Amino acid sequence: MAPAWSLLLALLLLSCNAICSLGCHLPHTHSLANRRVLTLLRQLRRVSPSSCLQDRNDFAFPQEALGGSQLQKAQAISVLHEVTQHTFQFFSVEGSAVVWDESLLDKLRDALDQQLTDLQFCLRQEEGLRGAPLLKEDSSLAVRKYFHRLTLYLQEKRHSPCAWEVVRAEVMRAFSSSTNLQERFRRKD
């Protein structure tokens, strides 16, 4: 379960160093926002993860649909955008405010919103250079279905604190693993 999550959300946190070589110049603040998201996710924890072990689930991340280990940097920008957008929406639903501190959620959404702004700029720049969208429709659909499964899980668990904790912990683990993906891209350069 963790390796699948790792690829999806690790892509979310590729820093400027991994993307800048594409001609997309994300500001230094983008990598600072990544660290801020990690800090905020840590601070959101309200339930002990060990008390929610029975609620863990395999959400079947579609690794192959997104190119797996063959994912190109240009496609990573699109994946980053897609995942960031869904993550933002995920933490913007009404049920999240019941479980977590509203001011922390606001800060998390602000950090994600800034990342979306940076990534949208890069998407427009890269699509302009290539003349076509960077993310294949199959990959986009796979990401949407994946987040839909997460939404269904929360609904099935009635947005319980443990269900939210499972999702938060998985996102946290995935964000933390982004360093490995970043190193992989650096070695390719």
From Swiss-Prot:
Its main location: secreted. PROSITE patterns: INTERFERON_A_B_D. SMART domains: IFabd. The keyword Disulfide bond applies. Pfam families: Interferon. GO terms for molecular function: cytokine activity; type I interferon receptor binding. Belongs to the alpha/beta interferon family. This is Interferon alpha-G. It comes from Bos taurus (Bovine). The gene is IFNAG.
